[in-house]
Every structure is written in structure tokens, then in C-alpha cells.
């Protein structure tokens, strides 16, 4: 993973045409779009008000959570979880599959899903952050990314996975 993150661009955004000068300039429109869609789905009775409330509380803290600038536009997988890691003989990582939302971004964006499914059990996020460093508010950023990603998936696919979403809205 670190090898992927070592691929850099001078701009943030889509791998084919990164065009944003900062990570927040890239991420905030996505954040606003997902939040607006979530509010509408909640008003229509399709999304729990508790989820939108958690999003509102997180959004109120956005400037604080993301106060430390991201200087490096790193290539990220965008959907990295334990199910997308290919492992060969001797438990050697042989590849990654399903690079949904691959882009030049905050490298920590790639880490939030390591705390989903069974990923936390393997200490993948903790190991990466200890080895390569973490931003000052990495834990809060990862929770923010996770919440927005799960709601984004609901907006696109219409399905929530309770054992992933429930810890995010507490």
C-alpha cells in the first residue's frame, strides 16, 4: 500500500485529470453532495434521521477535523478493505482488486475501511499509521471518511450494512 501512496501528483482528484490545488477543494464538494442527498433521503423516509444527525454533528466539526493541511496528493485505491487484498503463499500480499474511486487524495482516506469488516482484527490501519505516520486528527478523519463513504454507498446502491454503519453513528 505504501508503494501505491508513493505515487504522487501535484494536484488532487481523478487519476486521469487531477485538477484541485488542495485536498479540501477536492473533497468538500463530494461531502456536500452526499450530505444533501442524505438529508433528502431522510426527509423521504429512506434513511434514518440518526444517520443524518451523526453527519450533521460531524459536518459541524469538519473545519476542526481537517484543520491540518494535506500536502501530498497520493494515489489511493479508494475502496481498500480486507476483501480487496489478494494474499498468496506465505501470507504475502500479491495485489489489490476493485480500485473504486481511485484518485490522488489524502493517503489516510485509504485507511478507514481497515477498521470495517474484520480489518480491525489484523491491526492494518494501526500498523500503517505507526510505520508511516499519522496526521494530528487521523482517528477523527477516518471516522468522518467512513461515515460519508457508507452513506455514499447507500445513496448509490440503496443498501446499508448495519454492522459497519452502527458504530459510525454512535
Give the predicted meaning of each segment.
Residues 36-53, 78-83, 101-107, 155-160, ...:
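Short, surface-exposed, charge-dense and proline/glycine-enriched linear segments
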Residues 3-78, 88:
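An alpha-helical support segment within catalytic cores of ATP-dependent transferases
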Residues 1-8, 150, 154:
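Hydrophobic recognition helices of helix-based DNA-binding modules
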Residues 32-35, 112-170:
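Helix-rich C-terminal or lid/interface subdomains of diverse kinases
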Residues 72-76, 81-140:
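Active-site Asp-x-Gly
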Residues 17-24, 28, 82, 101, ...:
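Alpha-helix N-cap/helix-start and coil->helix boundary motif
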Residues 8, 89, 100, 146-149:
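Residues that line or immediately flank small-molecule/substrate-binding pockets and catalytic motifs
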Amino acid at each position: 500500500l505504501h508503494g501505491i501512496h508513493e505515487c504522487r501528483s501535484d494536484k488532487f482528484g481523478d487519476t486521469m485529470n487531477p485538477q484541485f490545488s488542495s485536498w479540501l477543494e477536492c473533497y468538500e464538494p463530494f461531502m456536500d453532495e452526499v450530505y444533501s442527498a442524505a438529508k433528502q433521503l431522510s426527509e423521504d423516509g429512506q434513511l434514518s434521521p440518526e444517520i443524518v444527525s451523526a453527519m450533521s454533528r460531524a459536518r459541524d466539526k469538519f473545519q476542526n477535523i481537517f484543520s491540518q493541511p494535506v500536502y501530498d496528493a497520493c494515489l489511493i485505491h479508494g475502496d481498500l478493505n480486507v476483501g480487496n487484498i489478494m494474499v498468496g503463499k506465505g501470507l504475502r500480499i500479491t495485489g489489490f482488486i476493485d480500485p473504486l474511486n481511485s484518485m490522488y487524495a489524502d493517503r489516510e482516506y485509504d485507511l478507514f475501511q481497515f477498521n470495517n469488516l474484520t480489518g480491525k482484527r489484523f491491526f492494518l490501519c494501526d500498523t500503517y499509521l505507526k510505520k508511516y505516520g499519522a496526521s494530528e486528527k487521523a482517528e477523527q478523519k477516518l471516522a468522518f471518511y467512513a461515515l460519508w463513504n457508507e452513506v455514499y454507498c447507500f445513496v448509490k446502491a440503496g443498501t446499508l450494512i448495519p454492522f459497519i454503519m452502527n458504530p459510525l453513528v454512535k
